[in-house]
Amino acid sequence: MTHTHDHEHDHNHEPDYITLVDENGNESLFQILITIDGQEEFGKNYVVLQPTEFEEDEQGLIDVLAYSFTENADGTEGDLQPIPEDAEDEWDMIEEVFNSFMDEQED
């Protein structure tokens, strides 16, 4: 199955940050790498985050997190929701858009 890259995403060069609070109340700061408009295909938007304090693995890779979100009716930011592991179409789209974004960053 092929997927065209027709999703809008933010190429903002000024980094934005978000603080996430885990179930134990610990706060962690993340940089927002990219937001993806998936409204037309999936009815929600997505965000890919990178911890501001991270360690690369032995291959030089860094773990990133992806969440879905819907904006509040007044246009303000909404809540982040985990993306189900079995939502293969959503994960495929996120991976494709994120990889394209990373390729553009390397140019």
From Swiss-Prot:
InterPro entries: UPF0473. It comes from the Bacteria. Transmembrane segments: none annotated. Disulfide bonds: none annotated. Belongs to the UPF0473 family. NCBIfam families: PRK13678.1-2 (NF010215). This is UPF0473 protein LL0144.
